Structure formats: C-alpha cells, structure tokens
Amino acid sequence: MTRLGWGRRMVFGAALAAVAILGACNGDESAERNRLPGFVSGSVRTTAYDGASDDLLTAGLGKTGLGSASAPGFANAARPTSAELRRLAIWSNYRALVDMSANGGYGRFWGPNVDLDGNDTLGEGKIPGTEYLAYSDDGSGSKNVTLLVQVPAGFNPAQPCIVTATSSGSRGVYGAISAAGEWALKRGCAVAYNDKGGGNGAHELMSDTITLIDGTLANAVLAGTSSLFTANVTSGDLATFNSRFPNRYAFKHAHSQQNPEQDWGHVTLQSVEFAYWALNEQFGPLIDGSRHGVRYRAGDIMTIAASVSNGGGASLAAAEQDTRGWITAVVVGEPQINVRMAPNVVVRSGGQPVPSFGRPLADYATLANLLEPCAAASASLAGAPYLSALPVATTQSIRTQRCATLAAAGLVSGADTQSQAADALAQLHAAGYLADSDLLQAPMWDSQAIPAIAVTYANAYTRSRVTDNLCNFSFATTNPATGAVAAPATSPMPAVFGVGNGVPPTAGIDLVFNTGAGVDHRLATPDASFAGALCLRQLWTNGMLGMPANVDAVRVNANLQGKPAIIVQGRSDSLVPVNHASRAYVAQNGISEAGRSQLVFYEVTNGQHFDAFLPVPGFDTRFVPVHYYNLQALNLMWKHLKNGAPLPPSQVIRTVPRGGTPGAAPALTSANLPPISAAPGANAITVGAGAIDVPL
C-alpha cells in the first residue's frame, strides 16, 4: 500500500503514466480543468494498493482470508490503525452479504477466485488499484456522507465503465463490496461506493467518542466537522442524559435527525460524479504540467447503478432522479423501496389479487415487530430455523407471553396460544406477507433483524434525538449473562467501524428497553417489551411525530426514464416482502413509464433476504442464494449494453432447494440454480398498464 495523503494524485508507475500521456494526445480531450465537485467536503485521501500485500477487493486477505471465520486482528486492540480497520471492514462486509460456506457456493459459484464466467481461475483474487476517499456534505459539517471510488489497475480508459455499490442496510462504505463491488472490479470498472449518510456512525456518549472517516477514534468536540457522526446534543443535555442513562450510544441512521433515506438517490448520484472526477484525475490530459483536464463528462461513461437491499432502493431512486445522464442502467437485488402507488395499480399472484401491496417499510416492519414473536408460536411453523443465542425455553416463553399480551390488548383473537399465533400469522398474510416466507417469521425476529429495523427507522422517520429514547428504547452495552445495561469490559468503539452494521444490536452494542436501568429488549419484560413495540406501531398507525411526512419524503415514483433495468428478489423474502417492494415497483412502473419501460423482474423461488444465513441449519436445506442471480443479472445487463443482447423477459425462476439434513445439506450445484430463461413460457411474469401478475 502506498499513501500520498489528502488531496494528492496517485500514479501507478510508467504504465499508468503512459496511459495519461496518450490521453493528453487525444484531440477530443478538453483543456477544461478537472475540478473537485462542490459537494466534496475537505480534501481527498488517495491510496494505491499493489495487489499483493493489500488490494481493493480483499484488503490483502485474498480468497482464503475472506473465507476464514477468524477475523483479521489489530496489533493494538485499543488503537487500531486505519489500514487494520479497513481490512476488518472489508472482511466483515464481504461476508455479511453472501454465503461463505464451500457447500453453499463460496469459491465455486462466487468469490474472489471465481471469474466472470463462473470458473475458478483467479487464484486468491487480489486486485491492485487506487482508492479515493472523501466526505460529501451540504456545508453544515453534519451530513458527511462517505464517498469512495475504487479504480482497478486494469481499468481501460478507452472503454470506461463505472458500477455503483451503494451500501446495503446501514453499513459503512464497504457495505456492498461483495454484492456489487467485486463484479465491477473483475470487469475492470471503477466502483462508486457511498454509505448513504448512515455509514455505521457511532457515538459513545459517556466518553464522547466518535469515529472519523477511516474508522479511527476521536473526541467528538475535538473532531468537529471531521466526525462521521456526532449526536446533536448540548453538553448540558448530554451530561444529564449520561447520568440517567449511562453506557448509551447514538447511531447515525437512527439519530442524525436528517431522515437520511430521503437523500439516498441523491448521494448515489454524487458518488458517480465523484468517480468521474477521480477518473479524470487519473486519465485526463495534463493541461499545465500538473493539473488535469476533463476527459469524461456526464454521460460519457457506461454506468450501472447496482447494489442490494437499501443499496438497491438507493440505486432505483438515483436512476429516477438522474437529470444529467450519470446512470446508464440499473441492476438491483431485493430493493428496500417505498413506492408512491397510483390508486389503479394491481398486484396479482396466479391471476388473483394479493391482499396487500406497496406498503412502506414503516408500516410493515412495525407490524411484523409486533406480531412475529406470537406468529412464531404457530404449530404450522414448527421446524423453522432457530436463529437466536437465547435458550429455546426462553424464546418459547417470549412467544407465549407476546401472544397473551396481544390477546389481552385485543390485537389478536383466540383463547389459547395456538389460536392466537394462528391469528397473528393470518394478519401477516393479510398484510401482504407470502406463505412462502412463513418459516422465516421466527428467525427474522429471533435474530433481532426486525426489532432493530423497527427501532432504527422509527427514530429516523420521526427525526428523534438519542436523548428522546423513542418508545423507551435505546442502544447500550449490556451484561451478557443478564441482559442488563452495564459498562463494557472494553469499549466496543475501536472495532465498530470494522464489524458494525449501523443498526444495533451490532458490534457489542445492544437494543435495550429502558425498564429500570435498561435491559435487552427481549428480556426486559416477559412479553419482550411489548409496550415499546406497540408504541412503534402506533407512531405509524396514528401518524405521530411527523412520521407520515418523513415516510412520504422517501417514496419514489417508479419512473426510470427509459433506462434498462433489472430487479431480482427472492419470493420468500420476509424482511422486505416482495409484494411491498419489487412487485409493487414493477406494477407502478407500468404506469409511470408505460411504453418507455425497459424494466424486467426476476422472482426467485426459495430465495430470501439474507444469503449470509444460508449456512444455518434449516436455511441450508430450504433456501438458495439470490446473490447468484444478482451476478447473472449483472452479466445479462453487461451483454445488453455492450452487444445489444436482449434482456430475458420478466419471469419466475424456479429453483431447487438443496434438501438433506439441516446443517448438513448437500453441496449446491447448478441443478439447484436453473438459468434465467430467454423464453420463460408459463413462468413469464405479465406486466402492463399498472398491473403485474406473477405465476404461482
């Protein structure tokens, strides 16, 4: 690794210099100076990686290191270096979005060693190149969206390409490195990353410690506007809060009071513009012996907006908002997207209207958080994967007690746990959750994915401060044995940039309900903090604290302006239900774009939201990797843009689960993963005039 500091350009030796000279001789080049976009705050950190000791894709770990369950360590655990934090962040984020087991496909169907044709030819898969790192800000010093551009050494300036890799979830800037960055780097494309203004920013309130852009720590006051995130709390209020609620943490997505989701499309476009600047710095002509001119202008570079989950939603929003031709095409997986639905839109399955579609996340996530623990007790869900560190008896008690409390509140019917659980599950079905996702209702709550999302997004959509303790929830370190809030043996802050996902519980920081001094929300009351879950639900149903307006601010119109686009989603997705996301978006697109639309949709049976869960017993036997189809979709789009190959029409892809014994499923093979068909026949999804009909 070579670092030349902030704002200085990297040159990769004679070969790259020769490319720059050739570029300067091109008569089509302009003498206009390449200027850093005005939204870039401060200077740019530029770092070169040799592809041996360190690299763009694996941080020097290679295929073997990324595949190891042992995280890369720190020489000094209390003060890790920025290079160590980057390595850990790449390791953890890569692994968070794909199945890392060999039987599940890592190293065979995907991975640094697997080439674009699916063959094991790339060895350890290390990729040399340059990174450009900077903040985007609005002048306030409080936005500080992290932008990162990776330019591989194999980038061809005569045939330039960019792929966006907007972070999934609320992850840091490397959050989509396996979902989109890897494919792009193998194609020789520059990668435009951004953290969406959530960025895993944490603020340890008692020590007033924050992270900087590279994950290293600083005092919040001393850091000032260089902080990734500092809670907007006066010193007096902070002292009062710390005395009443010690060992608490603020997180950027939840507590920035900026509703960052409303800007996800905008910052994705900024990441592309920043990538143009970086490419002009490397390949633009020299105009005065030291400064570079503009070789590439908006629209000159083939750019695919790509990512998954929240990053997928951001990509769609960016394509809708693009007015300068920054984005050529879109390829997204399982997009979390809130669609502004026309009243005449219809979503059908097997010719029959589905009971509910197009709900925003604020609606379905708070409902699921309320009902899932009870629904999980249904006998029809027996054998669902168990995804909790709690004893089974504790989890069963939570389910029974949540059902009883829901019944007492008149929110479910039934005289016993089984009838109450059946009613809770029926309500989820009525709210648009597919029966295909039934066996995932329990693990989505048990893993705390749904509670975490409900709390974080409720805070964001109400622009709440950390000191508000919205619905009596907060984020804190706890005693592992009891769940009670407690001072940590060692602060989680040194590693939070490396291992955190931005949505507690994460990186040793838990989601707590503030009963007494505060307890893990699952253990705070017998019914797992029902009062807090009901409060979150009522914020939406009663339109409280500005939530409806802030949710409306994140909605999109499903107008991609005629850009070719592919959406891939698993039918069994129970985190972002397909009726509310992809199906709704495609149906609305039929009105918003009508005849201009070039959008196709591939719905994957036996596909769910978290490929990283696939090694878990019961996941391995039932579900297939959606990531595989995301990669196929990217390849299809590449051939479409480069060669004019038609995109296969919208269709259901009927996969075959691996089966076998939970925890010991047979190895994934191509027989489990049928190709996307050019002629899907009876599996074709019908789309038009505001209606979508998905075959059963």
UniProtKB/Swiss-Prot annotation:
Uppermost EC category: hydrolase
Location of the protein in the cell: Secreted
GO BP annotation list: butyrate metabolic process
Top-level lineage group: Bacteria
InterPro entries per UniProt: OHBut_olig_hydro_put (IPR016582)
Pathway: Lipid metabolism; butanoate metabolism
Active-site residues, Swiss-Prot/TrEMBL: S309 (charge relay system)
Pfam family, one: 3HBOH
Key words, A-Z: Hydrolase, Secreted, Signal
Coiled coil: none
Catalytic activity line of the entry: (3R)-hydroxybutanoate dimer + H2O = 2 (R)-3-hydroxybutanoate + H(+)
Extent of the signal sequence: 1-20
EC number from the UniProt entry: 3.1.1.22
MF-aspect GO terms: hydroxybutyrate-dimer hydrolase activity
GO CC terms of this entry: extracellular space
Function: Participates in the degradation of poly-3-hydroxybutyrate (PHB). It works downstream of poly(3-hydroxybutyrate) depolymerase, hydrolyzing D(-)-3-hydroxybutyrate oligomers of various length (3HB-oligomers) into 3HB-monomers.
Family statement: Belongs to the D-(-)-3-hydroxybutyrate oligomer hydrolase family.
Protein name as it appears in the record: D-(-)-3-hydroxybutyrate oligomer hydrolase
Native source species: Burkholderia lata (strain ATCC 17760 / DSM 23089 / LMG 22485 / NCIMB 9086 / R18194 / 383)
